[in-house]
Amino acid sequence: MSIDNELSKCRNIGIMAHIDAGKTTTTERILFYTGKQNRIGEVHEGAASMDWMEQEKERGITITSAATTCFWNDHRINIIDTPGHVDFTIEVERSLRVLDGAVAVFDGVAGVEPQSETVWRQADKYNVPRICFMNKMDRMGANFYRCVDMVIDRLGATPLVLQLPIGIEKDFVGVVDLLEMRSIIWDEESLGASFHYGEIPGDMIDIAHEYRHKLLESAVELNDDAMNLYFEGKEVPVSLLKNCIRLGVIQSKFVPVLCGSAFKNRGVQPLLDAVVDFLPAPNDVAMIEGIDVKTSNPVSIKSSVNEKFVALAFKVMTDKFVGSLTFIRIYSGKLSSKTTVLNAVKNSTESIGRILLMHANNREDITEAKAGDIVALAGLKKTVTGDTLCALDYPVVLERMEFPDPVMEIAVEPKSTADQEKMGIALSRLVSEDPSLGMCVNPESGQTILKGMGELHLEVIVDRMRREFNVEANIGAPQVAYRETITKSVEIEYIHKKQTGGAGQFAKVNILFEPLPPGSGFQFESKITGGAIPKEYIPGVQNGLEAIRGSGMLAGFPVIDFKATLFDGAFHEVDSSPLAFELAAKGAFRDMVNKAGAILLEPIMKVEIVTPDEYMGDVIGDVNSRRGRVAEMQDRNNTKVILAFIPLAKMFGYVKDLRSMSQGRAQYSMYFSCYEQVPDNILASEIKK
């Protein structure tokens, strides 16, 4: 077998979903049926091999993405099991960036939940082909057909149903295979390892033919031969039909839908077949785009072992046995241990020591990795998440990842002098691992401020600091990470002039400040022509604006969603310098504050609340009291689903209040939606602080 033919038998996939939809349970069954492990690890028992952190075992949730490799039907499947909790969405983001395909797991009762929408959009962003697995079909209230409708309505996707469930809720025993038009029934005694094929149940023949017709209509459009056979009324061979589906999945025309119950050991083997049959190999996806460092020209990187080595570092973590581990996805070429590669972002070299295949937190040393592989490198010194590693004679940079801004912060103080130094080391290490985690020191109080994606995120970080680094710390109450922005365009001319005994300082800048749409961040542009300001001084202007916008205008919060355009200025042959222009930019920013309509922004959370009917009035009243607005209400079995938008500042401790008003029967989930202007009374209190 040629090496690139071997590449066609590789699948890099992620398992993604809302929390508690059954991602890790599904992954554990995959590992059992592929022979990767000889027992099934259950999440609720804290025994899932993919949830290896102590915090994951205790909470029964996935916190960090875990990688593993297994084999099925002569194909190698590299799997990344990702978290479903919104606080750890960064793990999903960086995993999807390096994957070729994904399995989206849905709760057969709840269907498409808020975090399902989030991860789906993340997969859309990176054009990741997907398969849907409707899980928990054995649960009371499970409804396969409603879940399929929700995929259309909430995700805007085109589902291609390949299976139908046989039996409802506790009577769910197997599936109808619409490709082969047969039933598949699982044997309970073998933990689902054994199953048998049979006839389609008589009461399902009509609906099976209906969905088979829909399947054929969608799939045959991808192949002329298949279309001709279909319109001539002839049977389309299963192999040709599978090729049509594969092409449609790779082109994101539709999303195959399968069903089962991972916990009851039903439906996992056909899911593995679908991964092999329909999700792309590394050499099926479009060529990766990069930038040639020397020429700044775009380059296309072909996924082949015979090309130059190019890889993306997508995760850095600390292992107590081997130190720093850098996870990479190799897009082209080969990598051997005891060689040297280039970090094209840092323009520095890295020596490759150990190359490791990972199974959760277990390691296997290998001497070589090649295109398509996902491996970990031990002991890299300078590489961080998003950096490109490449051959020394092929300096290219791949597109960097974008990470969300933290929305919550806490003050962290060491309990003793001995903890002081250890805390600095611990936090530096944790921040380097997690791009969604931020740290700074309050210049007035001297307190260390830790910024994260939510209460659980920060709670886990503090817990890791204590367990892994033996640091005891006092933790302040969570605070909202507000932002500031401008609402008007304004032109500012500012002259910085200072004369001391020796050389003076002189810089003149003319800057246009403009508001940008939400989510745009900060943008800087120079329109200097004719040498009004020498090129070497312009970065000083940008640096000055970057530095001062972090200190805010109203209440000391970072300023976002605005553009600064440097369109004119002046310099002095002797007295001008990059520092002078940096100070001039800061002065222009300060002058702009009172003229550009500065406002304070607060994070708004999209909240989904599931409550029994009898508590709906209390729940809605409580939402309104939190400055929230109800956007939508739906019926789901015997419960009401309320979709609301509520300021994060009003969500602290909400879980306790919700349990209290519903006698513990209601539940909720939330994720960041957008920033909105805060009411004047909140603005006044924040300015006082």
Curated annotation (Swiss-Prot):
<keyword id="KW-0963">Cytoplasm</keyword>
<dbReference type="InterPro" id="IPR000640">
    <property type="entry name" value="EFG_V-like"/>
</dbReference>
<dbReference type="GO" id="GO:0005737">
    <property type="term" value="C:cytoplasm"/>
</dbReference>
<keyword id="KW-0342">GTP-binding</keyword>
<dbReference type="InterPro" id="IPR020568">
    <property type="entry name" value="Ribosomal_Su5_D2-typ_SF"/>
</dbReference>
<dbReference type="Pfam" id="PF14492">
    <property type="entry name" value="EFG_III"/>
</dbReference>
<feature type="domain" description="tr-type G">
    <location>
        <begin position="8"/>
        <end position="283"/>
    </location>
</feature>
<dbReference type="Pfam" id="PF00679">
    <property type="entry name" value="EFG_C"/>
</dbReference>
<feature type="binding site">
    <location>
        <begin position="17"/>
        <end position="24"/>
    </location>
    <ligand>
        <name>GTP</name>
    </ligand>
</feature>
<feature type="binding site">
    <location>
        <begin position="81"/>
        <end position="85"/>
    </location>
    <ligand>
        <name>GTP</name>
    </ligand>
</feature>
<keyword id="KW-0547">Nucleotide-binding</keyword>
<keyword id="KW-0648">Protein biosynthesis</keyword>
<keyword id="KW-0251">Elongation factor</keyword>
<dbReference type="InterPro" id="IPR053905">
    <property type="entry name" value="EF-G-like_DII"/>
</dbReference>
<dbReference type="InterPro" id="IPR041095">
    <property type="entry name" value="EFG_II"/>
</dbReference>
<dbReference type="InterPro" id="IPR014721">
    <property type="entry name" value="Ribsml_uS5_D2-typ_fold_subgr"/>
</dbReference>
<dbReference type="InterPro" id="IPR004540">
    <property type="entry name" value="Transl_elong_EFG/EF2"/>
</dbReference>
<dbReference type="InterPro" id="IPR031157">
    <property type="entry name" value="G_TR_CS"/>
</dbReference>
<comment type="similarity">
    <text>Belongs to the TRAFAC class translation factor GTPase superfamily. Classic translation factor GTPase family. EF-G/EF-2 subfamily.</text>
</comment>
<dbReference type="InterPro" id="IPR000795">
    <property type="entry name" value="T_Tr_GTP-bd_dom"/>
</dbReference>
<dbReference type="Pfam" id="PF03764">
    <property type="entry name" value="EFG_IV"/>
</dbReference>
<dbReference type="GO" id="GO:0032790">
    <property type="term" value="P:ribosome disassembly"/>
</dbReference>
<dbReference type="Pfam" id="PF22042">
    <property type="entry name" value="EF-G_D2"/>
</dbReference>
<dbReference type="InterPro" id="IPR005517">
    <property type="entry name" value="Transl_elong_EFG/EF2_IV"/>
</dbReference>
<dbReference type="GO" id="GO:0003746">
    <property type="term" value="F:translation elongation factor activity"/>
</dbReference>
<dbReference type="InterPro" id="IPR009022">
    <property type="entry name" value="EFG_III"/>
</dbReference>
<dbReference type="GO" id="GO:0005525">
    <property type="term" value="F:GTP binding"/>
</dbReference>
<dbReference type="Pfam" id="PF00009">
    <property type="entry name" value="GTP_EFTU"/>
</dbReference>
<dbReference type="InterPro" id="IPR035647">
    <property type="entry name" value="EFG_III/V"/>
</dbReference>
<comment type="function">
    <text>Catalyzes the GTP-dependent ribosomal translocation step during translation elongation. During this step, the ribosome changes from the pre-translocational (PRE) to the post-translocational (POST) state as the newly formed A-site-bound peptidyl-tRNA and P-site-bound deacylated tRNA move to the P and E sites, respectively. Catalyzes the coordinated movement of the two tRNA molecules, the mRNA and conformational changes in the ribosome.</text>
</comment>
<dbReference type="GO" id="GO:0003924">
    <property type="term" value="F:GTPase activity"/>
</dbReference>
<dbReference type="InterPro" id="IPR035649">
    <property type="entry name" value="EFG_V"/>
</dbReference>
<dbReference type="InterPro" id="IPR009000">
    <property type="entry name" value="Transl_B-barrel_sf"/>
</dbReference>
<dbReference type="InterPro" id="IPR047872">
    <property type="entry name" value="EFG_IV"/>
</dbReference>
<protein>
    <recommendedName>
        <fullName>Elongation factor G</fullName>
    </recommendedName>
</protein>
<dbReference type="InterPro" id="IPR027417">
    <property type="entry name" value="P-loop_NTPase"/>
</dbReference>
<feature type="binding site">
    <location>
        <begin position="135"/>
        <end position="138"/>
    </location>
    <ligand>
        <name>GTP</name>
    </ligand>
</feature>
<dbReference type="InterPro" id="IPR005225">
    <property type="entry name" value="Small_GTP-bd"/>
</dbReference>
